[in-house]
Amino acid sequence: MTPLRQFSMTPLAKKGANPTMPGSFGRRARPVVLAWALPLLLGFVFLGAAATSAQAQVGSITGKITDESGDPVPFANVFIKGTQLGGTANAEGKFTIIKIPVGTYTMTAKSVGHAPIDKTVQVNANQVSTVDFKISEQAVKMKAVDIKGDIKIAIRKKDSSTKQIVTSEDLRSLPVDNYKEAIGLKAGVISQGGELHFRGGRGDEVLTIVNGIASRNPLRAEGVDLGLLAVSSSEQVMGGLDAQYGNALSGVISLTTREGGDKFGGEIRYFTDRYGEADKSFNNFERLSTGFGGPFLFPKTNYFISFEGTYTDTYLRNTATHQEHRFLNFIRLGNRQSNSAKLSSKLTFKLTPNEKLNLEVIKNQDLIGEYQNRWNRAGFVQVRHDSTAPTDGNVSTRYGAWSYFQVDSTYVPVNTAEHLPVNTEDYLQTALTWKHTLGVGTIYNLRASRQQWNSSRDVLDRMPWEYQQQPNNYYDFTNRVDGAYYVTNGDYPFYERKKTVTWTLNGDFSKKVGSHNLMTGGDINYNDFGFLRTSYPNVVTGQGLYGADRDEFRAFNPEGSFFMQDRWEYEGMVLNAGVRYDEFSVGNQISSAEVRDRTKSQISPRIGIAYPISDRDVMSFHYGRLFQVPDRQYIYQGRLFSATSRGNPNLEPQTTISYQLGVQHLFSKDIYGQFGVYFKDIFGLLTTVEQEIPGFAITVPTYVNADYASSRGVEFTLIKRFSHGFSGEVNYTYGNATGTASDPNRALAAAGNLRDQFKPTSEQPLNWDQRQNISATLGLGNEKDWRASFVYQFGSGFPYTPHEREERRQNPDLINSKRLPSVSTLSMQGERFFRAWGQSLTLYVQGTNLLDGENISDLEPTNWPDGAINPQAYNIYYTETGRAGGAFLTQDQDGDGREDWFPVHDPRVFAQGRTIRVGLGVQF
């Protein structure tokens, strides 16, 4: 990647200067997203990188030891090779080993007078792997037999939290593009606009943890993404968070990445929709992914590397042109409208049977072009010259009439989509983990990491002073019945740079003492932020800075936490109790006159009870007080007078008080059910109010802790593991999520809109308040020949606020008072296994939204500049006619004395339609 040219955040000496300042943000290089991935991928094959699973990522092994006649072998010994984990079978030959870190192990069973036997077993997070041994009475040495233990469902008899599991096999077989889509199928989760809402909470209230390290950008609460082949398992803690989890109001997504085994192996996958004739399901989609690993160059060392590159023009394809590159002469890779590359590498050093050192590197890059319906015209525009308007003597160029063809010499080519911003996201994590097993039930973990997020939003990689804009934001008005309503303003006038660097050191220690399982730990974080956002970036303000409405800051802050928890087993009942202490400092960048307390702290108790009614039933209850520090941009932003809103260094942590009651029932060895009821009260949420800037007689909208919300609901999950040729899962949620606002900027938007000046005085449905949601999956096939997975989703309508044409003031009671139509999708993935040229091959066919349903996803997408066509015009059109897709008002066509609607058919209003992809996989 080429060096970045820097620009200053200090006043300019003169207009047009190109200042530099080390350490500032600068022009980013915009390479093909795949360009950096291939050299790194080859390099990591030889260098490696890795991290261990978090302490919370453990499972259990159970089984029975019998002799050749089927009789139990009492008191036989069973242990896991290379560790100090093991146990002794009871008088019936049954054994259980708990708290085993996720991974693949070799187990040995032996008894006096019997030959030892080995079996290989895969341990998954919070699941029980069953391994039965049949040992021979002949005293002979037997070879190891590689038999993977069958994963059977087991109820969590000691757990008072509600959890949902997504395995690596789920991610391979389901028709999903990422792990978040798989999580969105679970009970208690509502997926809307790319965000996951756990039990009615906001989308930024879910914490993502990767191998025991929190991976969420503290500036704006975005989590890390991983390729499908990089994930070993995903555990979602929906409720009942123990004290080890903090800074999350709604839930936790805990991801475990894959490790290399003792033998080299892996797979390559390629998916595309580029086949046959292009139709409306053709999105110019291609995905190339691989995951492979095995022993490394040194003894007791393993590695695993995964890469996933996804390139597509999406169903929101604009008219911009993109440079295309070929790979292997038939695979066409980036740059397209949406380009994504994810690289994960993991290196594991097993120093001794009880000590393991891990190094992990994760590198992601996304390059995504925007779609705006009114900035999506390729054709010709008439040029007009105006020499009277300018005061500097120069001739002003303005664009006027538009045409698909060149009418005469006054018409010049224009492609407005190429003047839209491109969003770039870069993420890099390096993590080092040390795991030490001191003895049976005694383990400690130490982790250190550095994470960096870089993001930008600009046009054609231009610096602020390079933007090109037309005077007075000139664009064609809607006086033409052919609907040629477009923007010829020049470059889309917004520019943004963000950077976050987070250093983390955390650890935990657990020990079993009698009937108590004790755990303690903590973490220390140091954050470094840089932020610049401006509109009209080529405008120079009176302070000599580029950009109107300029918002800029550089900030540093430390924070940390400490927790203690105990799992106490007493006469069949299990008490999970803990307490957590969190501390946060705003740093020293803000003057003392504005800060009441630079350091804030809170104590959050957690208590839960699990009561096994029988070996098939468990009841549980949990109470928790949860805190979350607001996104740091709401603390530090708006330090310049030109900013439209101002951060508040005196913000308090947002708070949730949650209760839940759960029941687990094991119907059979293959069928499991889970039922839960939850109640959540959330307060201290962010909104804006007008406040005076200290020392100045002006007021600015300032973020405060004033909003509140609540959610109630019931959840039901029924799982059937694969047996007798099929598997299935049903998840149902009935929930009610209400509050005073759905977004911290709701009041800010209302202040700038005469229609919405009145704020609600009571709780109303939140934007993601989908009262009923059901998902059902069905898996068919066999391991030898074929497999097919079907996914059906149904959700009741999301709320929306109706608007009327002559409305002057919005009645606050009408906010989210109406409901959109229900949504539903049917998707599938089919796989056919065969062998060719000595390799295992798989043919794939994947289809999403097979019924091609028109599901409304966003009734009011952003439009700039507003003019006569704006988000509320879309809303008014839907309110009056019941038709979605957007429209603007034009002259009276039917003679009734009122302006008539002209539809614009904005595809952003709807979710993606039917897509069909085919693929090929190679396993080795």
Predicted regions located by residue number:
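Gram-negative outer-membrane beta-barrel transporters
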Residues: 269, 679-681, 700-803, 921
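Periplasm-facing N-terminal accessory domains of Gram-negative outer-membrane beta-barrel systems
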Residues: 54-150
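Surface-exposed extracellular loop regions of Gram-negative outer-membrane beta-barrel proteins
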Residues: 530-536, 541-542, 585-587, 611, ...
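C-terminal beta-signal and adjacent terminal beta-strands/loops
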Residues: 785-789, 793-806, 832-924
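Periplasmic N-terminal accessory/gating domains of Gram-negative outer-membrane beta-barrel systems
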Residues: 115, 121-130, 143-242, 247-252, ...
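Transmembrane beta-barrel wall of Gram-negative outer-membrane proteins
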Residues: 282-371, 422-443, 605
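Signature of Gram-negative outer-membrane beta-barrel scaffolds
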Residues: 330, 487-496, 501, 517-617, ...
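Outer-membrane beta-barrel signature, preferentially recognizing the C-terminal barrel domain
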Residues: 184, 416-427, 434, 498, ...
